[in-house]
Amino acid sequence: MNPATRAALLRSLAPLALMGLIFYLSAQPSSGVHPWWEIIGRKLGHVTGYLLLTLLWAWALNGVARRPVLVAVAISFAYACSDEYHQTFVRGRTGTPVDVGVDAIGMAIAAWLMHRRPQAAKTEQFKDAGRSPTRAY
C-alpha cells in the first residue's frame, strides 16, 4: 500500500469518529430545554460540527484526492442528508432540509477557510519579497 494512502486511511479515523459522534447526538430525543435555547444550540452545533467534519475530511484526503476540499464537502453534504433522514426515526426529532442548509453553512465556511489559507500564505510570500501579489512582474 502506498504510504500516502496508508496515512490517509489513518487520518480518516478522525472524521469517521466525528461522524459517529454526530450520529449519536442526532439519535438523542429532544430535551426539555427552553425552545429558543435548544434551537440556537442545535443550529450552532450543526454549523460547528459540519465545519469541523469538512476540515477533517479535507485533511484526511490531502495528498490522495485531487481536490480534497471538494471531496470533503461532498462527503459532508451526503452525511448531512443521511443524518437528517436518520433523525426522522428518532422520537421528538425531525429531519429537515433546513438543517441540511445550516450544515452547508459550516461546510461553506470550512471550504472558504481552506481556500483562504493558501492565499494568505501567498500574500505573505510576496510581502517578504517586497512585491504585491496582485501585480505581475
Regions of interest found by a model, annotated:
Residues 1-58:
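"…centered on the first transmembrane helix and the immediately adjacent amphipathic helix/loop
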Residues 3-4, 60-67, 116-124:
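Membrane-interface junctions at the ends of membrane-embedded or membrane-associated helices
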Residues 7-13, 32, 64-71, 96-97:
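Membrane-helix interface segments
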Residues 15-26, 69-87:
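Small-polar-interrupted transmembrane alpha-helices in polytopic inner-membrane proteins
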Residues 32-39, 81-104:
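Interfacial helix-loop-helix junctions of multi-pass membrane proteins
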Residues 42-54, 76-87, 95:
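Short, conserved structural micro-motifs that define repeat-unit consensus positions
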Residues 49-63, 105-118:
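Membrane-interfacial alpha-helical segments at the cytosolic side of multi-pass membrane proteins
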Residues 122-137:
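Short, intrinsically disordered terminal tails adjacent to the first/last structured region
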